[in-house]
């Protein structure tokens, strides 16, 4: 049986996005992304955690698997991350979207 993920990392979770065999859960309550790795057996294991701006709600990965964009509805900010081959995230910037405070929903292409 899989080891439970620590509560501080996961509560509350709003959205999960898959990118190249990794899953990124948006944790609105802790302003983090939980990174999970998929195994060949279908079990997920916690691979790490990355900080975001407050109010993490939705996320979207690019089709190439190179970038992950995270909407933080608290202040209408979109955080931008580069996805490494091993699934780790590097923050590359953030953008304030006018009128997007409290918003939900994001798409990447």
Question: What do the PLM-derived regions correspond to, one by one?
Answer:
Residues 7-23, 50-67, 97-109:
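Beta-rich, blade/repeat-based domains predominating
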Residues 25-29, 70-74:
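Conserved beta-strand positions in repeat-built beta-propeller and related beta-rich domains
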Residues 71-109:
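Blade-level signature of beta-propeller repeat domains, shared across WD40, Kelch, NHL, RCC1
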Residues 24-27, 34-36:
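Short, conserved beta-strand edge motifs with alternating hydrophobic and charged residues
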Residues 1-7, 44-52, 89-98:
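Beta-propeller fold detector
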Residues 31, 42, 66, 76, ...:
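Glycine-centered loop/turn positions within well-structured domains
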Residues 1, 35-44, 80-89:
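Short loop/turn segments immediately following beta-strands, especially the blade-tip
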Residues 18, 38, 61-63, 83, ...:
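Generic beta-strand structural signal
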């Amino acid at each position: 049986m899989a080891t439970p993920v620590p509560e501080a990392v996961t509560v509350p979770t709003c959205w999960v996005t898959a990118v190249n065999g990794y899953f990124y859960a948006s944790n609105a309550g802790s302003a983090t992304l939980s990174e999970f790795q998929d195994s060949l057996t279908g079990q997920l294991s916690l691979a790490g955690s990355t900080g975001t701006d407050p109010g993490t709600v939705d996320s979207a990965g690019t089709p190439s698997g190179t970038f992950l964009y995270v909407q933080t509805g608290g202040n209408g900010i979109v955080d931008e991350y580069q996805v490494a081959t091993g699934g780790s995230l590097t923050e590359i910037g953030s953008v304030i979207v006018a009128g997007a405070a409290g918003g939900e929903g994001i798409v990447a292409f």
